[in-house]
Amino acid sequence: MDVARATEVHVHRMRILLADDNAALRQTVRQIIEENPRWRICGEAADGRTAVELARRLNPDVVILDYKMPLMNGVEAAHLIGSFLPRASMVLFTGEATKAVVEQARGSGIAAVLSKAGNGYLRLLSFIDRVSTETQGRHSAPPGKRKSTKRHGPSDLGAGPRCLRISR
């Protein structure tokens, strides 16, 4: 047996679904996310309805949703996705990160509403990193020691001026 192979540790690659009607933004987010070898975009959608269909088919760990999309907005898509993927961590990454949007997102399964403005990409990467770290801990722990697989709740995320926590 190859010693290098025997000591190799399986690393779970975080599967991320990205839904935004702006193709240039999707391309930028994809490039930034895939710089991390632990993460990969498993699918992209330009509208909410396609996001729901892809989530059902691809079973992502993280779903990034824009608020304003054709056919179905991000909050409506999150309600549907959460009904069949309760363990997926969902984030609303939007230019509309207002208190009104946070109120609409309440109870949808969305863990955070992040603004695209300012350091939006850094906040998004921080969210994914936190989910990735917690997911990796669940996959690498012995079966009796694995952490809960609940979705992120509002107490899991720090809130800043451009990161609004939501309550369930």
Summary of predicted features, one role per range:
Residues 1-15, 122-168:
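Non-catalytic signal-transmission and effector/linker regions of two-component phosphorelay proteins
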Residues 12-25, 29-33:
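Conserved acidic segment of CheY-like receiver
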Residues 47-50, 72-76:
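Acidic catalytic/metal-coordinating carboxylates
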Residues 53, 75-86:
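Short amphipathic alpha-helix used as the core "switch/output" element in two-component signaling
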Residues 58-64:
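Active-site beta3 strand of CheY-like receiver
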Residues 69:
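Receiver (REC) domain active-site loop signature in two-component systems and cognate sites
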Residues 76, 97-126, 130:
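Alpha4 helix (beta4-alpha4-beta5 surface) of REC/receiver domains from two-component response regulators
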